[in-house]
Amino acid sequence: MELPVPQKLPDPPRSFDEFLKSQNWDYWPRDVHFRDSDIWEDTLKKLEEAISYTSIYSYLWTNVPRLYDIVDSLESKLKESSHLLQHHASRLFESDKMISKKRSYTNLERYKAFVKEHYRPKKIALSDRMETEKNIEGCTFLFNQNEVTQLPRHLDAKQIYLYVLKTHNFEEKVFKVWKTHVLSDCSIALLHDSFWWWFLHKFKPDKRDEDFLFDRIAESYVTLFIKIPLRRKDAFFKMYPDCLTQAVYTTFQESFPESCSLFNDKFKEDLGNTIFLWLSGLKPETGFWTHWKLQDLCTTTIHGSRRVPVKLRRSVIPSQEHIPGIRDLKIEDILKNPRAYAMPKLMKESVASKAATKPSHYRSLGPEFHKVLFDFGGQSPLILYYLKMHELGGISVTHNPKGTKFTKILREPSPAPTYCDIIRDAKRKFADNKKDFKRVKQRIKDDIKFLREQQELIDKELDRIQAKASKNLQEVKNEFENFLHKQRVEAKLKEEYGGSTSASESPQSMQSPQSSSSFPTISEDFNNVEEG
């Protein structure tokens, strides 16, 4: 009896495109249509109730044992230790019982004299490798296959990471979780190798060492990616590229303070673009470094001490070498109080550097966007490089023509006045208009005051003439004719020299018609009285 020849089974699909081809599908997932929709709806409702927060919480509360005894004993021990600490602290600060004030000052002076007499400055012999300068030119890199190369000037990567994490102002619980992952061995190695790779790439190119470092960077990143729990991956790796970029930038500022002029905005932009592309495959937004809280690194170290300006340091050290009288001057004194030795120009520069500038957008419609096909096989070049380096198959980097798209900035808006500039100009114009309004208002008040004074003078003159009219009619008539003659002469002069009248003459011209109109009535009354 002949056995049937076994048929060769087809190979399983190794990529997303092969899977669609084997199923004769154009896209996936397919739309599922259920026959008994009511039964499926009941099943889905029961499933939602079973996996709800309340049901899971009640199940855990019922079945998971709770060890309250351990917590109670720990709390009691903490309270006991706290009481003991308070008791000992109170005894320590009872200075009247423990220290004699009269003897303390005499002993202090005696100890100071003893220390001053027998003081010898300590001399520490540094190896050639430990003696590093504070600039880019004096630093060299030596690759070690078995361990990471230490940072310049014996900087501690953990201290740098902690400094960067504290600038983010995380909550206490979030800070503790991120601190555990960021200070892990693979993350520390990632900072070391990324710093040295960027140092070689930017300042002292060496293709061989850069390739070795990049291999180790990929290893460290994949190890870190695997160690992060699944529920925290998205949140952590959304924050980590920016954190690593800030840590590398901080390391450059701490390692080479004399070369801080090289670490400008373009340096930060290139560094951030490189690290973001390594870890996520995407570039960050333009000007991402503006939200960093590292502006004081040029003048302050990560430990809070003030930096001595480079110009001041270069001027102090040669003077100590050539002038014998300044050899006793300690550089520590300058470090403690650099303002006492700095010039006013440096003080102005330090004050100007502290002035915070608020970012503002251009007055425009904003950047132009366009849709870009998302590459599912190249989200992280480091992970992809790691898989290729270890010759792991099943990696497809081809684009799916019907895949997911995401929005990308096509063109940034052209430079234009910002909204802050517009608001500042509007405030300035408003202030100028307010000043002009006050000036015009004051001038109108002065004109009204002048007109009232002229009106009062004319009224007084008329009252005086009317008072004299009852006493001596002939004298009043002569004075009145003189007054009219004077008014006619002034009016004639104004007509001849019109256009050159002063501000004081304008109110008189305004009042002259009124006065001339009233004078004929007075003359008529005077003639009637004379005839009578």
UniProtKB/Swiss-Prot annotation:
Residues 432-482 form a coiled coil. Residues 500-523 have a biased composition (Low complexity). Keywords: Coiled coil. The keyword Transmembrane does not apply. InterPro entries: FAM227. Residues 494-532 are annotated as: Disordered. It holds the Pfam family FWWh. PANTHER family: PROTEIN FAM227B (PTHR33560:SF2). Belongs to the FAM227 family. This is Protein FAM227B.
